């Protein structure tokens, strides 16, 4: 399964580090070139309630290529129309964009890519970006939990795929 975290800032970098550490193939995508360069050259450094460094693969949006089975969307919601339209060609035929954003952005995203490609997820932990490539996990590692929901068009297989991917993070 090919996965991307689009908007890999503080939360996305922590999530991507855990997922990569546990064997997932995930691209961390961020428009901040300094952050992307630091991630690629030094790895994702996570401090705070943990202390780890994980080699990760990071890209800027213009470096994206190919198709993804799952794109975890972690940008600000006000950017969704532009970002989701940009991401649509990068989804496989049964690919899913999973929102990890404040609010209820899924109906607007479904208008662009369809309910069969839209899932929602709430994150119950916090992080902060300290400097390019370095994030602080502000929650206890054993509290890294998610609450998922799906639109009517999402299959049980798609839901299970995302559930297993997120369970693999820690």
Predicted regions and their residues:
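NAD(P)+-binding Rossmann beta1-loop-alpha1 motif at the extreme N-terminus of oxidoreductases
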Residues: 1-47
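Residue-level detector of alpha-helix initiation sites
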Residues: 10, 78-80, 104
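Conserved SAM-binding loop
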Residues: 28, 72, 99
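Rossmann-like NAD(P)-binding element
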Residues: 50, 54-91
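Rossmann-fold dinucleotide-binding core
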Residues: 66, 100, 105-170
């Amino acid at each position: 399964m090919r996965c991307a975290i689009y908007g890999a800032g503080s939360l996305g970098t922590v999530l991507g580090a855990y997922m990569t550490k546990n064997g997932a193939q995930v691209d961390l995508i961020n428009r901040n070139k300094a952050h992307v360069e630091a991630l690629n050259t030094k790895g994702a450094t996570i401090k705070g309630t943990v202390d780890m460094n994980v080699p990760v693969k990071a890209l800027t949006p213009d470096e994206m290529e190919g198709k993804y089975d799952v794109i975890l969307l972690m940008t600000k919601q006000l950017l969704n129309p532009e970002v989701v339209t940009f991401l649509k060609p990068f989804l496989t035929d049964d690919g899913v964009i999973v929102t990890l954003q404040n609010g209820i952005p899924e109906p607007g995203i479904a208008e662009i890519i369809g309910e069969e490609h839209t899932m929602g997820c709430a994150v119950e932990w916090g992080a902060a970006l300290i400097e390019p490539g370095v994030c602080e996990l502000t929650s206890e590692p054993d509290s890294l939990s998610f609450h998922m929901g799906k639109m009517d068009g999402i299959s049980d297989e798609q839901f299970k795929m995302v559930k297993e991917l997120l369970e693999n993070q820690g």
